[in-house]
Structures are given as C-alpha cells and as structure tokens.
Design a protein with these regions (language model features):
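Active-site beta-strand/loop signature of hydrolases that rely on acidic residues for catalysis
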Residues: 1, 34, 59-67, 95, ...
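Active-site neighborhood of phospho(di)ester-bond hydrolases with catalytic His/Asp-centered motifs
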Residues: 1, 12-16, 188-192, 214-220, ...
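Active-site environment of divalent metal-dependent phosphoester hydrolases
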Residues: 1-4, 22-28, 195-200, 223-226, ...
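Metal-dependent phosphoester-hydrolase catalytic domains
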Residues: 2-75
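Conserved beta-sheet core of the metallophosphoesterase superfamily
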Residues: 3-26, 30, 35, 132, ...
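Acidic, histidine-bearing metal-coordination/catalytic regions of metal-dependent phosphoesterases
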Residues: 39, 58-61, 66-189, 208-210
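Extended active-site neighborhood of metal-dependent phosphoesterases/phosphodiesterases
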Residues: 150-176, 229-326, 357, 361, ...
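Conserved, compact domain cores that house catalytic/ligand-binding motifs in diverse enzymes
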Residues: 183-261, 270
C-alpha cells in the first residue's frame, strides 16, 4: 500500500525488490529513488540502477540511478529558424534545438499540401546534436513557399534502444525563392554591429515599412564567439529581429568573426554556399561576388600565435576570381555587386594585401557597386575617386 500511494505522485526509479537494510546483510527494502511527476521533467528512461555494496558508511546501502529525463515540448526549440543559401531551386533551413531531436521540415506552396524534408547522412538521419540544417530541394524559382519545423525529442538513443520524448511543431513560415527573371529587389545590409544592440535597434527602426527580399550581414556582426552558446545567441540576436525565418540571411565574415575560441565552430552554424566563406550568387539579374579578406594584420602578428593562414585563403580567392570573372553567370548578369567586409579599395589600414592581389583583376570589370565596411566611417566613392575603379559604398561603425 505504501508504494502504491507513492506511485500516485511519483515515478519509481529504484528496484523495490532489492533489499537495502541493514547494510551488512540487507533483508528489507527501506530506500527508494523516485521522481515527482509534477516537476514537468517526467522521468522517461532509467538507464541504469544499482544498490551499492557499501557496508560501513551507513546502516542503509546507497542507491545510484542514471536517468534520462524528457525535455518538455515547449523547450525543445526556443529560437526561430533562419534561412540560408537562397537559390532559385532550393532553400536551407537552419535551427538549433535545446535537446537532440528527430527533426524534419514540412513545406509546400500552401500549408495544407506539404512534403517532408530531413537531413540524411549516409543513409541515416542526422540526429546526434542540437545543430540542424535541412535543405529544401526541387523548389520553383520565384514561388512562395510555406514551411514549419517539426521536432520529436530523443530522450535516449543507443544501438538497440531508442526512446522518443515530447514533440514540438512551429507555426508556418513563408519565403519566396529568387528568380533569374527578377529585375528589382530590395536588400538590407548591416555591418560592424559589434553586439551593440542600441545601434542595431536604431537601424532596424529605419527599416520599418520596407519590403525587403533578403539581408546581408557584412562582417563584424557576430564578433569573437567564445563558445557555441555565445555563437548561437549572437546569430539569433541579429536574425530574429529581421525575420530571418522568412527572409534569407547571408553572413559575410569580418576580421572579428575569425577571432576567439569558437570562430572556426561558426562554420557549422552558418550555411555557407559550398562550404566556402567566399563565392558568388545571383539574385534576379544581379550577380553578387563575395570575398573574405581575412584578418587586418599579417599572419605572423604575435597575437595570432601562429594559428592563422589567411595568405592561403586570399590566394585561393585569386583563383576563384579569375574563374568567376570569365564565368557565364557573371558575363550574362545585368548588374554586378562586389561585397567584402574589409575594402579592396578605400581601405585605411596599413596592411592592404588585397589591393595588390585583386586590384588588377577587378579594374575594368563591370561592377556597378562595391559594398564594404571595417573602417567604421561611412563614405561613398564615385568611380575614379580615391582609386576606386567603380562606385564604392563603405558602411559605418556601431556608434549611435
């Protein structure tokens, strides 16, 4: 009767058939482990239980239990998803969960007739970590799509035993795929926010009423990530306010993104096209060419402790630029925009390897505009002024 009353409000963990008293020669079960059902973290799986053979520490033998507790459904995901790597025929949905989950995305041209997408790696669903990246394939250019994220917690997963937990389904979000036929679009470009929330809020107020198509964060907007939690927090601090769940976001590395312990870890949280921090993409009839110019000081600067090799990265982009500038996508585009955090031209740093590396390649190319940042001083250079081979707009710093 005693155990029956306990089970009304508790989930039993211990094995009631194993005696625990007296410690030297146990004959009775007087010790129990139980979890209160009202805690909201209901016990899901008892992974192991043991009555320890300890005869002298107490007159009762100690109990040890290893438990796996469910994560409540409402806490499986506490951030919005964000769209990455937008293409006419695909879109990448990225999100982080607060527990490892069986995850998929339901999507379609309406919210009723949907199909399911998930990430399969070598025949297995990728459900071993809180980072999730799901690509929606076979989309039609210039079409509106609806999607939602669906989660089932994985409370316990081993070779021959899997226990599913609570579920969560987000609301439906919507996005529009780009089309090569688009001739007009609007993009928001932010740079050098440096976690200054007041500056970001002031800039966001200027965007009220603007129907934009995508957002570019042109460097130093995710500065110096200390660890994964800090990196995730910074990403959502900038993507959630601009509706990154419905407006694709393009992250460009600045020199502050590549500092601190977790800087390389950022790669798994950002949907870089083809896994590269530089590249090119089309939005409508416009070709964007993106460069990652690395740090603003030489690789052998003492503060880098011999761990950087941005010289190789810049040289790789020489080869990329040569191929890109003669590519069909570049040549057939009606407009061309060059984007980099550190300016190739209009840079005030003492260390300017990129002007020498890329200057001769870029001069004479049909770029309509270059967007850059880094200097923390807003400036516009007409073609032919200050050594600019095409118009250059340089964004300012985070002061308000």
């Amino acid at each position: 009767p005693f155990i029956k009353r306990i089970r009304q409000h508790f989930s039993m963990v211990s094995d009631n058939a194993v005696p625990t008293f007296p410690a030297d020669k146990p004959k009775e079960t007087l010790d129990y482990i139980a979890v209160l059902k009202a805690t909201g973290a209901e016990m899901a799986v008892r992974k192991s239980f043991e009555v320890v053979e300890e005869n002298t520490a107490s007159d009762h033998r100690p109990l040890v239990a290893d438990l796996a507790l469910k994560t409540p459904g409402g806490k499986l995901m506490t951030h919005e998803p964000y769209l990455q790597d937008p293409r006419p025929d695909r879109m990448t949905v990225m999100f982080q969960t607060d527990a490892v989950c069986h995850a998929w995305v339901e999507f379609g041209t309406d919210s009723i007739h949907t199909q399911r997408a998930r990430t399969i790696v070598g025949g297995q669903e990728a459900c071993y970590d809180i980072e999730n990246k799901i690509v929606l394939h076979d989309l039609k250019p210039g079409h509106e799509y609806y999607y939602r994220v669906c989660l089932v917690g994985l409370t316990y997963k081993r070779a021959y035993e899997t226990h599913f937990g609570d579920t969560l389904t987000t609301r439906f979000y919507k996005f529009r795929t780009p089309s090569d036929n688009d001739t007009d679009f609007t993009a928001l470009v932010f740079n050098d926010l440096h976690q200054n929330s007041k500056a970001y809020e002031a800039l966001l107020k200027k965007t009220v009423g603007i129907d934009y198509d995508f957002v570019i964060f042109n460097g130093d907007c995710l500065p110096e990530p200390r660890d994964r939690a800090h990196a995730i927090r910074m990403i959502h601090n900038v993507t959630d306010p601009v509706g990154g769940a419905e407006k694709p976001v393009i992250f460009i590395r600045g020199n502050h993104e590549i500092r601190d312990f977790y800087s390389v870890g950022m790669h798994s949280l950002i949907g870089y096209r083809d896994g590269l921090t530089y590249g090119a993409f089309n939005w409508g009839d416009t070709r964007f060419v993106v460069l990652d110019l690395g740090e603003d000081k030489p690789d052998d600067t003492w503060v880098y402790y011999g761990l950087n090799d941005f010289t190789s990265l810049r040289n790789d982009q020489v080869r990329f630029l040569k191929e890109e500038l003669r590519s069909r996508d570049f040549r057939k585009a009606a407009r061309h925009i060059l984007v980099s955090h550190i300016p190739v031209f209009a840079n005030t740093d003492k260390y300017q390897p990129c002007t020498e590396l890329y200057g001769s390649l870029l001069k004479g190319q049909p770029f309509d505009l270059a967007l850059c940042a880094h200097v923390h001083e807003t400036a516009f250079y007409e073609k032919g002024t200050g050594g600019a081979p095409f118009p250059i707009f340089r964004g300012g710093g985070p002061s308000v």
